[in-house]
């Protein structure tokens, strides 16, 4: 079974559901509100575990009421939390508005995630024992870089989701095996709007790129082959929160199982398609049997 380590954020998502997202200065009435465990790191960990991997989470929660709930959610999905530490202060939160088309806008408050600025004893050994390391940018960049360099030193595949998008140091990109931005993040990193051109520009910095394109599917680019476009299943989206993390978690599992890249992307797209038909981030993530049924249908 593929062993995946995830170094990243754990947040409680505070989700308001509205008919139409408010404009600046506008107040609207929501139709529902929920607190849902999330955070890009935790989401990817849960997605990978439900997709069939052995998963370990490295990160931090606060000593508030949200911390134990997040830990319990991870463990219930099969994620090992021995390296998820509890620190003084609040757990990270994500304040999310979801409109009636399934689109969202998100503000993240780091909380305990801001304390994950270095690896602690035991983290390096965990990363070294994994088949892949999943990274995102909701924790301090120092820890992301330390994780990537540790993975490279031990021959562990590193998959980086550059979100929230920001300028990235060359040494982090040099330690990245696969970069998985969405089209907006790819444009932010390169200054190029067209995903094919943005992907080509990113290949100057990383060996392989998968750009997620929402309902349009995903695009794979590498230095030694033609670009590969893989469509997404056609579904009606209810809530797109966490869809990208679902894709990354499932993709990591498929690659760990040595599936060809086209099959791995299509399998991950099937997982993401299932997730957008349900509300919430981690709550929407499908199990392996569901992914297989969707993929083969």
Language-model segments: residues:
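Short acidic/glycine-enriched loop/turn segments that link adjacent beta-strands
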Residues: 89-92
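Conserved phosphate-binding/catalytic region of the ribokinase-like
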Residues: 1-4, 167, 195-297
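Glycine-rich phosphate/adenosyl-contacting loop at the front of the ribokinase-like
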Residues: 1-60, 65-76, 236-238
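Short glycine/proline- and charge-enriched loop/turn segments
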Residues: 22-30, 180-182, 228-231
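Nucleotide phosphate-binding site architecture
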Residues: 13, 187, 282
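Hydrophobic packing within well-folded, soluble alpha/beta domains
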Residues: 48, 57, 70, 74, ...
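Ribokinase/PfkB-type carbohydrate-kinase core domain
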Residues: 1-10, 68-86, 96-229
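Glutamine-centric residue-chemistry signal
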Residues: 44, 136-138, 282
